[in-house]
Each structure stands twice: as C-alpha cells, then as structure tokens.
Regions:
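Short coil/turn segments at secondary-structure boundaries
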Residues: 137-142
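Amphipathic alpha-helical interaction segments
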Residues: 121, 150-151
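Short linear X-Pro dipeptides
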Residues: 111-113, 149-150, 157
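Acidic, metal-coordinating catalytic cores used for nucleic-acid/nucleotide bond scission
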Residues: 46-47, 144-147
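P-loop NTPase Walker
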Residues: 1-135
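Accessory nucleic-acid engagement/destabilization modules that flank
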Residues: 154-163
Length: 163
C-alpha cells in the first residue's frame, strides 16, 4: 500500500512530526510492517523524542475510544485518492480501539530497537553491529572529552613518528 522511502525536509512548525507519525502508523496498519522494521531518523534527540511521543499519543487516543479511531482514520486517509481509499477498504481493517491498542503495544515493545532515532545514533549502532564491514578491526566506542583528547594525542604522535 505505502510505496517507497520518504524524506521530509521542511522548516520548523510545518507538520513534519505529524507526517512522520502518520507514515509510521500507515506502514503498520495498511502494510503490516512491524515497528522495528521502520526507521525514522532526525538530527536531534529532542526531535526523535517528539516523533516518538506524537506516535504514542495518536495511537493511545485511537485505542481509548471510537471517537479517537474516527479521528485517526480521517488522519490516515487524508490526501489519498479514491482508488487508494478503495484499496484500503479492501484490506478489511478493523477500525476499532483494540486494533490501535495492538499497534500501541507493538510500538512500546519495540522501543529498544531505536527505530526512531538520531542519524548519529543510528549510524553508530550500524557501525557497532558490523565493525568489520565498515573496515574497523576493533569494537567501536563513543569517546568522552578526555578519551577524545587522548585519541587525538595518540594520532598526532603516530603522524610525527612517521615523518
């Protein structure tokens, strides 16, 4: 149902968080994608937290009442063509609070996977899981300020010793 990847670039206050949460819910509800297989990346921890909280809030509201389901259904189907809406109707989705409670449960249970994350934390996780594939011989670690200074000193000494 939902095709391809999506990149959202826009100024503050233009609805990026709402759009990402909508896309996340659509992938789970319409395509059956598990939350740990969806990646939403942003630049700041605050933005990642905002996306996650918006997703939880929308799912919680839909899980709490039929009115919440109706609101969420309108949000999810907004801007779809009539053909796309008919295709979604053909999926026979149970538009009930229980359906959204199940999605909410899945998102909460998958929070440790970090599918909503900052770019740097996502890349660090990739490199940490596959160091050899990225050309590292040893495990990768994040350095604190002192560790960073020590590493720079070692690198400088190594360069000076070669010259």
């Amino acid at each position: 149902m939902i095709e391809g990847n999506l990149l959202i670039r826009a100024s503050a206050g233009t609805g990026k968080t709402f759009s990402l949460a909508t896309r996340f819910i659509r992938l789970m509800l319409f395509d059956g994608v598990e939350p740990e297989r969806i990646v939403a990346l942003t630049f700041s921890r605050a933005a990642a937290q905002e996306i996650y909280e918006a997703l939880l809030k929308r799912l919680w509201k839909a899980a709490a009442s039929a009115e919440g389901v109706a609101t969420e259904r309108r949000n999810l189907l907004k801007n779809f063509s009539e053909d796309k809406k008919r295709a979604i109707d053909a999926l026979k989705i149970a538009w009930t609070p229980a359906t959204f409670a199940d999605l909410l449960r899945k998102v909460v249970n998958a929070q440790h996977t970090g599918s909503i994350a900052t770019l740097d934390s996502f890349i660090l996780r990739l490199v940490g899981n596959f160091p050899l594939e990225f050309g590292f011989q040893n495990a990768v670690e994040v350095l604190d300020t002192k560790g960073e200074m020590d590493a720079l000193d070692r690198a400088k000494r190594a360069v000076l010793e070669r010259t």
